[in-house]
Amino acid sequence: MKKSAVLNEHISKAIATIGHFDLLTINDAGMPIPNDHRRIDLAVTKNLPRFIDVLATVLEEMEIQKIYLAEEIKEHNPTQLQQIKQLISSEIEIIFIPHEEMKSNLAHPLNKGNIRTGETTPYSNIALESNVTF
């Protein structure tokens, strides 16, 4: 049995295929994720699993250099923003973009996976940009 953090085979596969500058998104339950091969639906019920728990687990296995968040999170979900900032290194660049642009990242050619959580707080969506480990 696998010993590392991510046990879900689809998330594990997405992370394994990621190269430098590729993206992986983690989303709340309301994000309109395209129904294609990149969709990884973990939602069981409202707030299960939580966005922040999935993010923390993915960060244990994925080297990132930059994150993208919706500009709207600052006003509409500052608690989630603080939790995200606590999880990531201060060296990681945070880029705030309009929520509509976050939606367009779901179909971006460099995006290797769109994870849907059960999160029901607004603007709990993130795009992780991969870095190299060397």
UniProtKB/Swiss-Prot annotation:
It is an enzyme of class 5 (isomerase). Its EC number is 5.4.99.62. InterPro entries: D-ribose_pyranase, RbsD-like_sf, RbsD_FucU. Its main location: cytoplasm. Disulfide bonds: none annotated. Pfam families: RbsD_FucU. Belongs to the RbsD / FucU family. RbsD subfamily. Catalyzes the interconversion of beta-pyran and beta-furan forms of D-ribose. This is D-ribose pyranase.
